[in-house]
From Swiss-Prot:
Inhibited by ionic detergents SDS (anions) and CTAB (cationic). Strongly inhibited by Zn(2+). The keyword Transmembrane does not apply. Gene3D superfamilies: alpha/beta hydrolase. Optimum temperature is 37 degrees Celsius. Optimum pH is 8.0. Stable between pH 6.0 to 9.0. Its EC number is 3.1.1.-. It catalyses: a fatty acid ester + H2O = an aliphatic alcohol + a fatty acid + H(+); a butanoate ester + H2O = an aliphatic alcohol + butanoate + H(+); an octanoate ester + H2O = an aliphatic alcohol + octanoate + H(+); decanoate ester + H2O = decanoate + an aliphatic alcohol + H(+). The keyword Methyltransferase does not apply. It holds the Pfam family Abhydrolase_3. Keywords: Hydrolase. SUPFAM superfamilies: alpha/beta-Hydrolases (SSF53474). This is Esterase LipI. Changing residue 165 to A: Complete loss of activity.
Amino acid sequence: MPSLDNTADEKPAIDPILLKVLDAVPFRLSIDDGIEAVRQRLRDLPRQPVHPELRVVDLAIDGPAGPIGTRIYWPPTCPDQAEAPVVLYFHGGGFVMGDLDTHDGTCRQHAVGADAIVVSVDYRLAPEHPYPAAIEDAWAATRWVAEHGRQVGADLGRIAVAGDSAGGTIAAVIAQRARDMGGPPIVFQLLWYPSTLWDQSLPSLAENADAPILDVKAIAAFSRWYAGEIDLHNPPAPMAPGRAENLADLPPAYIAVAGYDPLRDDGIRYGELLAAAGVPVEVHNAQTLVHGYVGYAGVVPAATEATNRGLVALRVVLHG
């Protein structure tokens, strides 16, 4: 497992193919021109069709503040009458952007790669809806799967959570809440470059302060919008899952981080904390990649390889 002691030693250069893609289609989570502008830039990113053959249904479910949009994907191997494992997917976007459409391709990748039903959750966004709105919506969706999942063919003995960036944070929180609430049982958590600690002393924040895609200025803005009135120097565990007093008895985890991501060491540290608590965990550092690399799978070979590695880990647990 990667260690915080050696993450910056002899780090290879950013993947050259990724650099060419970033030059051709520039994208940065800059907040200089306001929240609506960055939301629109994310929506406007060009996206290649991914597994268009999948059966997909949009469904509104009951939430704590009104209907929550979800999108359900069935893997091609899932016959109408068979039960399949189910993955609750929480999209990234710094808690302030992203929706069912921005992460449609990612969810299709997960449905095929994990051979599982995927339920994508359109949780409420900050700053209009600061913490804990996203968590409460995610938990409502988790309870919906536990209570109604069989209606869509889900095997309730094989529920996993997954998410990228802010969604990885949410997935980690939901895994903890499910343990604390006595269910539903979560069998695996796939966390793509999450933020779990809100620890400003982690070395990667300085090392990758001006990294492509996501820089520390954007992280600070997103964190403040999400936190609302909460002191970011002492966030509660349901907001920063790495600060939970008890990390034992959580589901096995795969934590993916990237060498050129300010959040790299956060994911590594959370992996160390889980391992110390006796939780089976694998942490993979894609040294030549950047935050958000799952979105470049299928375009950048190194991103494809790193993404497939996490999906294989998920698939093995769900179909072991």
